[in-house]
Amino acid sequence: RGEIFGLLGPNGAGKSTSFKMMCGLAKPTGGTAKIMGIDILENPSKARSNLGYMAQKFSLYGNLTLRQNLEFFASVYGINFLNKDKRVDEIIDIFNFHDIQDMKSQDLPLGFKQRLSLACAVIHNPPILFLDEPTSGVDVIARREFWNHITSLAKLGVTILVTTHFMDEAEYCNRISL
């Protein structure tokens, strides 16, 4: 709990494919994967309820506002109606989205899109978080700020698995696999 595990390697090494298999989004040819003791192949829905996943490519809905994206993902992750608005407001506070919550996500700068993607992945308070090259294409300042959010989540006990090909990002990790 609370560790950041890095999967470091060049493009094409299979980092994203490995993540997709561990999250139940791609079927492995063999072996097993368990999330919180739940076999991802036998009970994918239950296993996925314990994890958040931020894809390398944005999974945001550009025609929805920042707030609407958060509300949508809260619904997808099963946050009930009574708690949804409260949780969305908490996320807006945590990520300091107050001034931009009514902007369409397609109009957000890249760094804010990255942060919104992370916010959507953690909206349901998962104990495990998969981040697939979360800072690719973002400027240095946005990368540092993004990693501040990641380390804050780890301090709260969230276990984080992150793929990267940046050596300086690997330094944030408690453990690394090549």
Q: Where do the protein language model's features map onto the residues?
A:
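Hydrophobic anchor residue at the start of the ABC signature
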Residues: 118
